[in-house]
Amino acid sequence: MKTKIASLIALFLTTVAINAQIDRSTMPKPGPDPVVKLGKPIKFTLDNGLKVIMVENHKLPRVSANLSIDNKPYLEGDIAGVSGMMGSLLGRGTKSISKDDFNEKVDFYGANISFFSSGAFGSSLTKYFPEILELMADGMQNPVFSKEEFDKELQVTLDNLKSNEKSVTSAARRVENVLTYGRNHPFGEFTSKESVEKITLENVINNYNTYYKPNNAYLVIEGDIDPKATKALVKDLFSGWQKGEIPTYKIPETKNVSNTEINFINMDNAVQSEIAIINNVDLTLGDDDYYAALLANNILGGGGTARLFMNLREDKGYTYGSYSSLRQNRYAGTFRATASVRNMVTDSSVVELQKEINKMRYKKVSAEELENSKEEYIGGFVMDVQKPRTVANFALNIERYNLPEDFYENYIKNIKAVTLDDVQNAAIKYFRGDQARIVITGKGIDVLKNLENTDYVIKYFDKEGNPTVKPPMTLPIPAGMTAENVVDKYIEAIGGKDKVDAIKTTMIVSNATIQGTPLVMTMKSSAPNKTLQEIAVMGNVMQKSVFNGETGYQSARGQKMDMQQAQIDEAKANLVPFSDMAYKKGTLDRIEPIDGVNYYVVQFNDTEVFYD
């Protein structure tokens, strides 16, 4: 027993001594940089020009194949959208198998195959991969473009365009591209109702026959493969794919504006402004300052700890998030700093965005910011290289951009070598705050007055990117026209005062399901000026609001609270069941044009009501 006690005491004292030597107030020293060994992919080229890259990885019994057609961008012109439609129609049957049988086979194997205008993708368990690659190859090389499927896809495309007609975000992205690249640039054209209606089945077939060729394509196969057997399979399935001469389009040079300007797109239905500060850049993967540019953008707007986010969201509360992106591209790169903000702070947001961009250019970032950004990139890179598909993509980039074989193995070293001067020089070169387009899509009547007080010239464009004039904010109110006149005309239009007065009670019942739980909201109103609003969950009333014409109360979860005098006054003013009768006492504030309709805007207390 004494021996055991002595041993325990000795162990306790040793533990105390070890703990006493640990200083938990200081950060532990970092270990050595991880060494990245990506391995050597297997590469070969078929006689038709198809370049094949195979990456072995036996961690999971799965294989994927990604075919990427690396054509130079081209202009689709009057039939913009034809390539997208062609890609959508691939995989809907081949010359040897119907659409339904094709899909049934893919489902039977528990696999995935998808086609698009610039390639295809397939993945499956290892034992089914030969069958899946065969289906994928058949769908790519022997498609059937039927009139029936074409008509269906045409209608789907038109329906999607129609549903986006009033989308502020869609209009913003569309016009941003038109202005940034130009209409004659492949990146600047867009699909429209007019261009889609001009597309014929023959156009789709011609697009496939012209551009869907192997001699500009890469096939990347990654996963649990036997290289020898897979190489033989690829040769068997793809050697018969006929190569062809692919026409090239001379891509226009993109240019920045001489001086920063505001490009405004008026959207009457916008409840917030879409802001994008954009300039063109010449940046390609592997450029000498590529890593410095990555880090500069990450510090400015790469995430939730970057400068734009911390300023516009955390400090000012203008937006849910503000970010920047630096797009490297062989044909036309761009820098963008963006935010979606409330109308009333649109001008202030522009000022803050520009302030952060110019601060990056004219003042060095701190050593701490640079170090944190490096660690973030290195950490993300180390995690990414654990994924087999990432390794396959790296191999593809090395081929596509003609990079050194050790480009990614030296990635960490090159990131760590970036200096404070390098970051500032990259910011000066790529963040052109002095030659940028500040593209704002929003509601002119709410934001233009303050934007006109900035130092920037404002140019106006419509939803298709065509130059236009400043939109009319309001129209003059005719002499003698009042809120009472407007409401009277509305009452007359819906049936007349007698019929309105005859309705003494209204009830609206709304049903919803939230995470499987049924919810019912009931709203009752009765003359003179009595209301009840009730929310019930699974039959139990969770919240209720009652007004009897003179007083009222609110209750929730068994707690009852009488209405305050201000709430009583507001309830009395509403004049239910038809609140419009109360609006007669409001003010006719303005006549506002919205989508070609002139709306009479009546202001009543804090409410604006639009009458057409």
Where are these regions (language model features)?
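C-terminal regions of mature proteins
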Residues: Q21-D33, Y218-V220, E371-M481
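Scaffold signal of the M16-like zinc-metallopeptidase fold and its non-catalytic homologs
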Residues: Q21-T26, R92, N164-K213, V234, ...
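An aromatic/glycine/proline-enriched structural segment found at the starts
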Residues: I22-K29, Y218-L283, G442, D446-P472
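M16/MPP (pitrilysin/insulinase) zinc-metallopeptidase core fold and M16-derived inactive scaffolds
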Residues: S64-T126, K166, P186-F190, G302-Y318, ...
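M16/insulysin-pitrilysin zinc metalloprotease superfamily fold
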Residues: G93-S96, S124-L154, T284, G303, ...
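Gly/Pro-enriched, hydrophobic low-complexity segments
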Residues: P227, V597-D612
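A structural supersecondary motif
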Residues: A276-I278, L300-V341
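N-terminal mature ectodomain segment of secretory-pathway/periplasmic proteins
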Residues: N485-D488, E492-K560, A582-R590, D606
